[in-house]
Amino acid sequence: MKNKFLICDECQAVNLKSLKRKLEKLDPEAEIEIGCQSYCGPGRRKTFAFVNNRPLAALTEEELMEKVTKQLKKPRDPEEEERLRKRNEERKRRKEEQDRKLKEKLKKHKAEK
């Protein structure tokens, strides 16, 4: 089973270019998905990546890469990964819904002025 990395292109603490390069070097065969991961709270203070749907975060990229390396050495449980994938998708869906409602509210507020 191929490894999968999810990394954010919007969070302040994530350096997309260097993190992507390091992950590609660690596992050239892995699938890398770039985009908002709806992990904004931790992403303001820590660099992070989702490794096979499991969130890993650290204060520095070096620390994160150590955690990623350890995670990749652990045996994988397909059922657990599926559960985590569903949880991540639900988190993203809720964030998109919140963003949509906020945009509607702002639009309505501007129309009232």
Curated annotation (Swiss-Prot):
A Pfam family annotated for this UniProt entry: DUF1450
Keyword line: Coiled coil
Coiled-coil residue spans: 78-113
Biased composition (Basic and acidic residues): 68-102
Region ranges (Disordered): 68-113
InterPro entries with a match to the protein in the record: DUF1450, UPF0741
Disulfide bonds: none
Segments of skewed composition (Basic residues): 103-113
UniProt record similarity statement: Belongs to the UPF0741 family.
Name by which UniProt lists this protein: UPF0741 protein SERP0241
UniProt source species: Staphylococcus epidermidis (strain ATCC 35984 / DSM 28319 / BCRC 17069 / CCUG 31568 / BM 3577 / RP62A)
